[in-house]
């Protein structure tokens, strides 16, 4: 709880749990429900653990609905999410969970399908073996030896100094931006060092098991909430970053978005032929395919519902083969078919001499006075980083001609601030593509033409419906723990019934290109609340999702609102459906006390927190990605985007990184000549 929650929420939960262990505290928090005693006897107060089950349940229901005592609602939310997640996601020493059979869930065993047995793990080569240095298993001596073996000039530090490493370019982060930048610079002949906080895994390491996979592949173990408790965030923290755990959607930057960024934000790059060529190059390197031979259950539901309503539905390109039927790519693709930066751009980089340091966290960029040269008062000369191994006692001082922050929209702003940068746009303008979900239950024995499959099978996103210019509908990846954490809790019995229907419950979500902006306050703390316009778009999109689910033949549909809003669809009339849809609302998080209903948004896309601008008044960096304050310091990740892009942003981020790193390579070449 402490590692996955904001400090205040964890402290609040601790206080409430302590109070519930006492009679006085239970009386204060539970009121009359804590009383016991037979008729005619004086009532006594029980501790929460001694209360009858039905009274404990009634207490939680009261906390869920309380309007003014929102701290109790926050504790309810926290306990509900974590307890259900742990119950359904965690496994024993045999990688099994005894509850999965009851809900119709099983983990796909992809390796059983291979014709030949795999070689032992130590005998198999990995795409990055020639360039990766996994520091968690090293000490000071073996670290320096590993760096030297990979062609880096590394000097040991004295008793109180840092180890010094020399290179041409240091890149913090190995995801969509950092991976592309590393490949482009290394292919131009420069010595590149990539710093990655997470660890390196390949297809052979991915288990598709929710609990362990979330723990080692995602920031904060995959349970990461905004500090104002409005949005659950999912962001990769491994080699390959988000590209290793995303849902494979490869959608080009929409033309109207490119025009907006060029005209309204004064960034001509986005209207240039070079950017279009970059998108072509990125899609080619990722092996993007446009079709899907067999869709999974949820996408079949989305497609059937759209077709029944006469709505357009588009096939979503993916960075995998058209026959890819993996439903667990969000835990790293166990088939190796999905092509993230860890198997493409980073492989290109290490083949050209780049070195990737895993288990290594950037502390700050090293800035020196620049005497106002080029309008920048500072110059970046490298990076200070800490290896997370207990055996490595000294920090790394990486000297570089060019330094690039590519650790994502949540981590780049704190890194730049800790380095001494002051631009007011650093950490502002955060966009999250907030998502609101709806669900539909499709019994297997339904008459007619049933939709076959289970909710966790098949490609995660293969179909998309565009509601408006700003809102799209897609399907999510929800394994048992995530499903249980996010669906409403009304009672213990109701929750069991929801989980019993897990395998045949299809989810779809409305995603909005948000205009409201959040703030990254520091590492691990951010605030976000959609504005009214975003909320209207989300409500319109969520209502459309429900119509699609009903049209697809769902027996029951509902939303994730805390009161469990739902509709039984058998024999439903048009007027009944419209009345139900009129009840659909987009609620804020449990901290907001204006209503007894609440909901959480979800976000897998974070953008804009160090946006590009035509001047220092408009953005944190210039149109080349270079800091307005420090020469030689660049940003090359999703935080650059001027606004939300409105679709899955992987292709946009990689294409932008392609253009910027190509320009950085040319700048380095120019510096050599002059």
Regions found by a protein language model. Give the residues of each.
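Flexible, low-complexity segments enriched for small/polar residues
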Residues: 1-108
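Rossmann-like flavin
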Residues: 48, 54-76, 87, 239, ...
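Conserved redox-cofactor binding core of oxidoreductases
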Residues: 81, 88, 97-150, 154, ...
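N-terminal Rossmann-like FAD-binding beta1-loop-alpha1 element of flavoenzymes
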Residues: 166-194
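Glycine-rich loop(s) and the adjacent beta-strand/alpha-helix scaffold that form part
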Residues: 184-211, 232, 238, 351, ...
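N-terminal FAD cofactor-binding segment of flavoenzymes
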Residues: 190, 197-256, 299-307
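FAD cofactor-binding and catalytic pocket of flavoenzymes
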Residues: 423-550, 556, 566, 596, ...
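A conserved FAD-binding loop/helix module that cradles the flavin
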Residues: 643-662
